[in-house]
A protein has these predicted regions:
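Residues forming the flavin
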Residues: 1-173
Length: 173
């Protein structure tokens, strides 16, 4: 870091999720879009001077109560949403800034420069949790979250062992 307040910040969504080609995680973590919006809005509020905030996404998943209102407020407050997956990030030696390359919705190659890039990393179960589930005899889904019945979400395949929190699947607090 150069200890300077950035003038432009980019958030890259779905890092490590919704991607069976690179990481094998096909599921949506379901919280990252809203976290990125909140962080971008707070960053703009606390910035000294203008701050350009951009959220690069495959699509925005705002499916909770009033989340769509929050999304619309973010747009109104100047958060820019770009529907694309950034395919490369390079350091610009002359400034230390980051150059992002992506293909826009029209199919054109775009290059933009940012002072800070935030990776919105998908939620996943740790190796230790997978090992513990194995020792306890708790079956897991292919996503490695607890395999439970949608109508009995805390029950697991092992009687007396219950799932809670993100062991059930990605979720907001």
């Amino acid at each position: 870091s150069d200890d300077q307040e950035p003038k432009r910040i980019a958030w890259l969504q779905c890092i490590g999720s919704r991607d069976t080609n690179q990481c094998g995680n096909s599921y949506c973590s379901s919280v990252c879009c809203m976290y990125a919006m909140k962080d971008a809005m707070i960053a703009k509020e606390h910035a000294h001077g203008g701050l350009d905030c951009t959220i690069f996404n495959m699509d925005i998943r705002s499916f909770g109560k009033d989340y769509e209102k929050y999304y619309n407020r973010a747009i109104k407050d100047g958060i820019r949403f770009v529907r694309s997956r950034v395919h490369s990030v390079d350091v610009l030696p002359e400034t230390g800034n980051l150059s992002l390359r992506y293909v826009d919705e029209a199919g054109g190659l775009q290059v933009e420069e940012y002072g800070l890039v935030v990776l919105s990393v998908g939620l996943q179960i740790s190796k230790d949790t997978v090992d513990l589930a194995g020792r306890l005899g708790v079956e897991l889904k292919p996503s490695r979250f607890a395999d439970s019945n949608v109508f009995k979400p805390v029950e697991t395949s092992r009687a007396g062992v219950f799932a809670c929190g993100v062991f059930q699947g990605p979720k907001d607090i």
